[in-house]
Amino acid sequence: MANVCVITGGGSGMGLATAKFIDKETILVLTGRTVAKLEKAKAILEAEGHEVHLIACDVSSRKDVHELCLFAASLGTIKTVIHSAGLSPAMADPEKIIRVNAIGTKNVNMEFCKYMNDGGVIVDVASSSAYQAPGFLVKHQIYEMAEYREDEFMKHMVREGNLAPGEYNKSGLAYTMSKNFVVWYAQKCAHEYAAKGIRVVSVSPGLIETDMGELEAEHAQNMIDATCAHRMGKPEELGFAIATIADERNGYLCGIDVLIDGGASTGKLFKK
């Protein structure tokens, strides 16, 4: 059977950029909420020689993700899952951000691990903001509730986001905490799924030149200034990195977060 690569948020941005670097012998399944974006991405990738299938999916819905798994499994062996779907602070309120970013990641990992076997890989896209989470708010015992006490998890995480002053800052804190969860959860899954031979890795991009990144640029000039190149990252740079991380030749790369922020996180230590 042919190998299948599923990319959530595959209609644009980093998801689409990653798809371009996936082996053309691998069947691509792109999913997202906006069908028009998916169809445009499909045309681009097919013109480059890829076989592409589309399915709409809201990752915050466990039912949607289950149906996505069934669809992908009907096409071949699910070898790779790139989970890049998510919402940024400018796109939604704290509740929706946490539901899509955190619960969405939980849904994707828990459902796809049932359909994957030895040699499979899940790459969860987090964010460099995960490293900015206030220590007193990072409570792994709360994170653990996501799998079995989802309502309590949501209530706690939304309450944390609302601690910040101002609507944008509330969404910003919720985003930071949701991505901190993604980093932690990917590491947890890496050790749990290892028995099946499935690798799990998270990737934390800095500010990237995508539609989502542009929405946040005005609030993040200091982050751009702190990078070594004094610019935002390009989607194709992240796409190549993610596709490389997912490559089976990187079999020892697992249970860790890969920070790709152009040096912004260390800039404050060395910039003069």
What are these regions (language model features)?
Residues 25-40:
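Conserved glycine-rich Rossmann-like NAD(P)H-binding loop of the short-chain dehydrogenase/reductase
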Residues 254-272:
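Short C-terminal tail/terminal secondary-structure segment
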Residues 107, 174-175, 202, 222-253, ...:
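C-terminal helical subdomain
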Residues 194, 199, 253-255:
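Short, small/polar-rich loop/turn modules that mediate ligand/substrate recognition or access, typified
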